[in-house]
Amino acid sequence: MSNLIPGEIIPEQGEIELNLGKEVKTVTVSNSGDRPVQVGSHYHFFEANKALIFDREITLGMRLDIPAGTAIRFEPGDTTDVKLVSYSGLKNAYGFNSLVNGSLDT
């Protein structure tokens, strides 16, 4: 009989560094809305809720630098700095708020 749990991940000992070698940008974000806004780890930050005020142009092709499956919540009136990393792979974005629907390479 095995003690393995289906789907279990057993990492090696030591620290695991996320997004190793990727360029990181820090962006200041303010929630100008009257409701909290939550943005997930792999959401195309450029297309985040319009109530979030930040320099959108520099966030094209970027996502939050946080573990997969997690999110950051922006409370109304709050201003915070977040770290972003660029997407990998084919660098295509479809859906979200339909602002790109294609290649993220400019």
UniProtKB/Swiss-Prot annotation:
Pathway linked to the protein: Nitrogen metabolism; urea degradation; CO(2) and NH(3) from urea (urease route): step 1/1
Family matches, as SUPFAM superfamilies: Urease, beta-subunit
EC class name: hydrolase
InterPro entries in the cross-refs: Urease_beta-like (IPR002019), Urease_betasu_sf (IPR036461), Urease_subunit (IPR050069)
Residue ranges of coiled coil: none
Main location per the UniProt record: cytoplasm
Sorted UniProt keywords: Cytoplasm, Hydrolase
GO biological process assignments: urea catabolic process
Domain of life of the organism encoding this protein: Bacteria
Subunit details: Heterotrimer of UreA (gamma), UreB (beta) and UreC (alpha) subunits. Three heterotrimers associate to form the active enzyme.
Sequence similarity: Belongs to the urease beta subunit family.
Protein name: Urease subunit beta
Lineage of the species this protein comes from: Bacteria, Bacillati, Cyanobacteriota, Cyanophyceae, Synechococcales
